Amino acid sequence: MKYTLLFLALILLSCNNKSQQTDTETETDQIVKPITIDAKKADYLYTFAYTCIDQEYPNKLGQVLGDSTYLKTPKELHPTFYGCFDWHSAVHGHWTLVNILNTYPDFKEKDEIIKKLQTTISKENVLKEIEYFDDVHNKTFERTYGWAWLLKLAKSLKESNIPELKALDKNLEPLTQLIENKCIEFFKKLNYPIRVGEHPNTAFGMSFALDYAENYSPELAKVIKERAKIFYQNDKGCPINWEPGGFDFLSPCLEEATLMLKVLPKKDYLTWLDQFLPGFRTQPSQYISPVEVVDKTDGKMAHLDGLNFSRTWCLYQIGKALDNNKMITLANTHFNDSYSKMDTGEYAGAHWLASFALHALKAGK
């Protein structure tokens, strides 16, 4: 009899422990939803891009001068992408407007946006952009950051259901093909990846270019996947605790992790990720937290707001693919931290941050 009572007690204890465990799992495994685009955010973000894509000054040209005849205004040199302070920001300013229209085809400012886009992305203007890249002194202009954003813009135009935007894709196509070929050529000959937290980051450039290439350029997709494996597949112990650098707007570790998510099968990716960022999958908030911008008037220091957004899109993509609520929660925290501080009136951030915020929102979709 005493053994029977002991057995029953053990069963009851086991059931109680199981019940407690289930409650704990329910608390920690609740579905966390990413922050996504809505009409209010679209209305807020479009103003940044709409205002700046035809604002010619201030402007940072990043030009190599062959002689005095090269000295021209930004609009003369880049009749399509002359606004938003620099070429790449003008490109992703266009991308922002196109994506807002793609998401909200009846957007209240649709006609005004399309009119402005038709003015900048004309056939004649695009041919002038190509002339600039053909110049012997500027063949590597905007490599690879601006190139990657150009392919993002092309992808969004190609996938639009708005006839006027489809027509603009045809206008842009010669430049798209030029950039596509430049990416193939460069990624093939690059011996070592560039691992910084700013524009030249190879993983970022490859990741954005691959998003385009998967549907529109089999050759570029093949090159990126092959080179990404050569560059990154054997990487271990990425020093994410060294991040961020003071001028970073990209996370070298997370950009690489996001690229490899697109390159490796899921099973292989899990093994790779746990070696590349040990412990990150289970406790990501122990490794990174939102960064603070001390001086938003300083263009380089303002990069850190962009870092919060780019971390967001990396964490969303990885977190959603792996059903990892902790990553999604951390992404939400990063997004909210910078989104609430965007409208400071400082052009140092206003000319580009809307694109980063929108891309983060799209990654959460």
What label would you give each PLM region?
Residues 27-82, 346:
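Low-complexity, Ser/Thr/Pro/Gly-enriched N-terminal "stalk/linker" regions
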